[in-house]
Amino acid sequence: MEEVDRILIHSLRSCGTEVPEDVQSIRQFNTELIVEAVVRCLRVINPSLGATLSHVLPPGMSARFRIGTSLAQACQDLGYPGEVGYQTFLYSSEPDIRALLIFLAEKLPRDSPEDAHQPAGKSALLQREIAATIKRQLSLPWLPSSCRICALRRSQNSCRLHRFHAQPLSLATDPTLKSIPDERKEYWQCYLPSVTSQLPHLPSVAASLLERNTSELSAKQEWDAEWKSQGLASRLSPEDYRSRKRQRLQKRIQEQLRQCAQLLAENHLPSSSSQDLTDMLKAFNLDGGSDQKKGSRFTRTQRFTYQQDPHTLKEQMQRAAEILPKKDAQDTDAEQQELSSLQEQIDSIEQEIRGLSESNKRLQLTVSQVEGEVNEMRQSCEEKEKIVRVKKRAVELLPDADNNLVKLQALVDASSHRMANLVGQWESHQVRLSEEYRELKRVQQEQEDESSRWMKDAKDLYEKIRGAADEAKRKEELYKQLLSEYESLPKEVSRAAYTQRILEIVSNIKKQKEEITKILSDTKELQKEINNLTGKVDRTFVVTDELVFKDAKKDEPVRKAYKYLAALHENCSQLIQTIEDTGTILREIRDLEEQIETETTKKTLSNLQKILEDYRAIKQENAQLLARIREA
C-alpha cells in the first residue's frame, strides 16, 4: 500500500493539490486535504462539474454538509461504484478514501495539459505567492489621503503634529514608604491635581510623561551602573554607600574652605573674612539642599559620582605647601580653634537646615491649602461683586424713580415692538427658507444616493478588473514557470520510471500469487494425509478391538489390555478434537485481529468524536439562528 499511496500522492500533486512534504500515505490525510484533493481531481476530470465546488472547507457545519453532499453527488455522476456520502469526506476511513482516490486517479486524462509536471512543495508555493503579492501591490496606483475611502485613509501630512514641549510634573510616589511625611501623603490623596490639570496645554501631557519616565529610567540606570562598578566592590549596603559619598563630599568642601581661609590669612584680610566664609557656607548648604531635589541629571551625576584623582590632589597639595609660608605653633593653634568653631557652626547650620526643611514642607502643605481657600473666597467675592454692582445701579436710579420707570417702560415697549417686528419678519422668511431647506435636503439626498450607487458600481468594477488582471498575471506566470520546468526536465523519464515500478509491482503480485497457490496445495496435501491417517487409525482400532475383545472374556490380562485400548482411543480422540478446536480458535483470533485492524483504520473513535463536536457546533448555530429570529 505504501507504493500505491506514493503514486496517488504524486498524481494529486500533479493535479494541483498542495500535499505537504511530510505526508507519505493516505492515512495521514485530514478532512481539509481530502476535500481539496477530490475537488482538484474533479476539476481536471470535468471542469464544468468541479467549477462550482470550492476546494477550501468552510468553518460552518451546514456549509460543510452541503459541500460533502455535492462532492458525493459529483463522484456518483462520474460512475463511482462504491458507497459515497457526506460522511465519506467529513468522517473518513482509510480504505474508503483510498478506493475513491484510486477511482479518481484512473479517471484523470492521461494526455491533458493539467497532467504536466507541476512544481510541488511549500517553498515553490511560497515564492509564487510572495512574487504575486509584491507585483499586485506595485501595480496599485498611489492615492492621496483625501481621495481614499475611510477604511484606508491615513494621515500623510503634518497638520496634527505638535512640538515636543515637556514640563515638570508633580507625581505621587509609593505611599507605603516610611520616610514620606503624613502631610505629604495627605496632600497627594486630597489636593494633588491630575496630570492633565497640571499642564496648561494638553499636547504637552504626553511629552512631559515621556520626559519624566526617561529621566527616572536614566537615573535608575546610572545608579545601577555605578552600584555594579563601585558599590558592590565597597561591600556596603546602598544606604551606607550613599552616606559615605555624602561624607566624602562634605570633607572635600571643608578642605576647600580651609584652604580658602589659609589664603585669606596669608593675604592679611580683615577678621570679618571668617564671617564671610560662614555666610558662604550657609549659602552653599542652602543651594546644595535645593539642588539635591531640583538639579538636573547631569549635576546629580557629577555630584554623586565625581571623585578627584588622588595624584592630582597630591600635586595640588604639594604646590600649595610650597607657596604658603611656614606657620608657627601659635598660628596652627589659632587655625585649629577656628576650624573647630567653623565645624561647630557647620553642625548647627546643618541642624537648622534640617529644621527649616521640615518647616518648609509643612508650610508648603499649608500654602496649598490656603491657596485653595483663597480661590474659593475669590470666586465668592466675584459673585458678590456682581450682585453689588446690580444693586448699586438700582440704588443710583432710586432718587428719580418715576422718570426712570417711565424711561424703562419706554425701553421695554420699544424692545417689545422691535421684537414683534423681528418675529413677523422671521415668520415671513421662515416659510421660504424652510421650503428651500427641504428642497436642498432632498436634492442632496438624491445626489448622495446617486453618488453612493456610482461609487459602489465603480468599486465592484474595479475589483473585478483587478481580480481578472491578477488572475491573468498569475496564470501567465504559472504557464511560463511550468513551460521552463517542462523544457528543463528530461523527456519520458517519469513515465519510464513509473512503468518500471508498475512492472515490479506486477512481478511481486505474481510471486505472492505463486506463494499463495503453493500454500493452498500444501494445505490440501496435509488435509488429505490427515484424512488417510485418520481412516487408517480408525480401521486399526476396529481390527484391534475385535481381536482383543474375543480373548477378553477368557483371560484377565487381556481384559485389562482391552480397557487400556479403549481409554487410549478415547484420549486420542479428545486430543485430536482439542487440536482441531485450538486451530479453530487461532483462526478466529486472526480473523478478529484483522477485523480490529480494519476498524482501527476506519478511525471509528475519532470519527465519533468529530460527529459529537459537529453536533455541538450545529446546536450552537441553531441557537444563534433562533436568537436572531427572536431579535428580528
From Swiss-Prot:
Record keywords, A-Z: Cytoplasm, Cytoskeleton, Endosome, Protein transport, Transport, Ubl conjugation pathway
Localization in the cell: Endosome; Cytoplasm, Cytoskeleton, Microtubule organizing center, Centrosome
InterPro entries, alphabetized: CCDC22, CCDC22_CC, CCDC22_N
Membrane-spanning parts: none
GO CC annotations on file: centrosome; endosome
GO biological process, one term: protein transport
Pfam families: CCDC22_CC, CCDC22_N
Highest taxon of source: Eukaryota
Record's keyword annotation contains Cytoplasm: yes
Function, as annotated: May be involved in regulation of NF-kappa-B signaling. May be involved in copper-dependent atp7a trafficking between the trans-Golgi network and vesicles in the cell periphery.
Family designation: Belongs to the CCDC22 family.
Name of protein: Coiled-coil domain-containing protein 22
Gene, per the UniProt record: ccdc22
